[in-house]
């Protein structure tokens, strides 16, 4: 009977992959939500700094000038 539970769990994992859903959900990318791009280091022209990236190393930069 234990083998049935193992087969059922493997079946669910396979079906979840087929459905296109990630097995481990990714964290929300806040930089992309703010229409930004992650750059290593600092932002250069024509981009300006709007925050930090999820990895903590890069800068979240947006194109254009602040108004």
Curated annotation (Swiss-Prot):
Alphabetized UniProt keyword annotations: Antibiotic, Antimicrobial, Defensin, Disulfide bond, Secreted, Signal
Chief place where the protein resides: secreted
Disulfide bond sites: 31-60, 38-53, 43-61
Induction: Induced in the theca layer of the F3 stage ovarian follicle by intravenous injection of LPS. Expression in the kidney and liver is not affected by intravenous injection of LPS.
An example Gene Ontology CC term for this record: extracellular space
GO molecular function: CCR6 chemokine receptor binding; chemoattractant activity
Record carries keyword Signal: yes
Name the UniProt record assigns to this protein: Gallinacin-7
Source organism: Gallus gallus (Chicken)
This protein's encoding gene: GAL7
